[in-house]
Amino acid sequence: MDTVRVRFAPSPTGSLHIGGARTALFNWLFARHHGGAFILRLEDTDTGRNIDEAAAQIVSSLRWLGIDWDEGYDRGGPFGPYRQSERFELYREEARRLLANGDAYWCYCTPEDLAAQREEARQRGEVPRYDGRCRQLTDDARREKEAAGIRPALRVKMPKTGTTVVKDRIRGEIGFDNATLDDIIVMKSNGGPTYNFACVVDDGAMRISHVIRAEEHLSNTPKQIVLFNLLGYALPEFVHVPMILAPDRSKLSKRHGATAVDEFRADGFLPEALINYLALLGWSPGSEQEQFTVEELVASFSLDAVSKHAAIYDVKKLTWLNAQYLNSLPQARVVEAVRPFMQEAGYLSATPNPAELDYLSRVVEAVRSRVHTLAELRDASAYFYRSDFEYDDKGVRKHFTKPGVTNILARGRDALSRLPAGRFTVEGTEEAFRQVIEELGVSGGTLIHPTRLALSGRTVGPGLFDIIAVLGKEECLLRLDRAIAWIGANVNNANRTDACS
């Protein structure tokens, strides 16, 4: 294969959505698989919008996903600049070339003229399209319109007979009847380029070898092929990847939950999991394997294994996959990923010291196998950082109201208090509790369940002895004292009140 040069060219008008992220990923994987170049280009010709913040957001999302680029608007390259707003002179130059070659003409039709043409076509039962009336304008007619203050747009003369064939890597050959193609505008009346024109000029000038983009751009392709040929650029290979649909096969939207990369990030998904999931939206690895490292994706990725059928977005599958990564990634990586969540909750300082990070690592070790996201990990860890929690109501009724529960908790507390520091481990505390259970002649749950509730406020979570080991001796004793006092003040008083009524 010749040198691979691919690009991701977002319009910076908002967050990077998963459709765009998947397109960027497929381009990036293809480039890395073939040792080619991946280019980040901004399609920011709409100068009426404030795009700097949106561009920064897109860049941040790509970097968070681990997608890097070889050339781009923020790092330059041999074919820059890489912002369309900085390439207007090139577009004007190429437009002048089309005009000089007789392939384009000035169109003086006003928006009102065009609206009237569309309405006339609808009344005739025809598909509305520009009727080409300005193709044959005389010089005198043009001067008259310009004297009237009408600023023209530049249109390209599209072929009116024959067929334009799109050779798509995924969909095969698709023919478009040239009679259906409008004489498209390439330069607007305000002097700016249109999307189709700027896209072709940029792809041609930047020597893009493969245009890998979303299926919805397929209808633009025959027009762009005509422009490629008129301008004399080498035609890239076109690859239109399938749409991503909601589970009900409707268009994916906000009502289906998070759809933007920064939303998934805020919800506690790992970039490793999201990249893995996006790769499988439309691409088949040809095996039952579901979890891939980035290196495995780069080695395995092939456009020939991309389906032409719509991919179905399934947040349950993504959530499951995220849980797999939470369990399989190195401990240090999960600690790094959850840090901002813990800092936002106030559990970790802005510049944590080694002791804080060591404690966080032990919390993560205890909790991560029971959660699906970093946000869940943060929430499930709350009682490791706060002792002012409320006790679960059902847990109170089930475990704190049993006769003799305060005595049982006190015996467990005494056993923990006698353990030396070197024995205050998972194994050491479990052995101490087993001895108490044997001495009392009760079931294990009789001591373990109320102790869990006393230490965490919850009835489910990590193993009790993992909780004890993480909290440490001093904190465990304080929480057991608090629970014993709370039962005496609340449960026992409530029982006495019930008895008197």
Swiss-Prot record:
Protein name stated in the entry: Glutamate--tRNA ligase
Gene3D superfamilies: 1.10.10.350, Glutamate-tRNA synthetase, class I, anticodon-binding domain 1, HUPs
Catalytic activity: tRNA(Glu) + L-glutamate + ATP = L-glutamyl-tRNA(Glu) + AMP + diphosphate
Keyword annotations from UniProtKB, A to Z: Aminoacyl-tRNA synthetase, ATP-binding, Cytoplasm, Ligase, Nucleotide-binding, Protein biosynthesis
Gene behind the chain: gltX
Subunit structure: Monomer.
Protein EC: 6.1.1.17
Residues bound to ATP: 254
Gene Ontology biological-process annotations: glutamyl-tRNA aminoacylation
Renumbered ranges of motif 'KMSKS' region: 251-255
Keyword match Heme: no
Domain of life: Bacteria
PROSITE patterns xref list: AA_TRNA_LIGASE_I (PS00178)
Keyword Transferase in annotation: no
SUPFAM superfamilies on file: An anticodon-binding domain of class I aminoacyl-tRNA synthetases (SSF48163), Nucleotidylyl transferase (SSF52374)
Pfam families for the chain: Anticodon_2 (PF19269), tRNA-synt_1c (PF00749)
Motif ('HIGH' region): 10-20
Function of the molecule: Catalyzes the attachment of glutamate to tRNA(Glu) in a two-step reaction: glutamate is first activated by ATP to form Glu-AMP and then transferred to the acceptor end of tRNA(Glu).
UniProt family annotation: Belongs to the class-I aminoacyl-tRNA synthetase family. Glutamate--tRNA ligase type 1 subfamily.
Organism encoding this protein: Desulforudis audaxviator (strain MP104C)
Coiled coil regions, renumbered to chain: none
GO cellular component, one term: cytosol
Subcellular location as annotated: Cytoplasm
Annotated GO MF terms: ATP binding; glutamate-tRNA ligase activity; tRNA binding; zinc ion binding
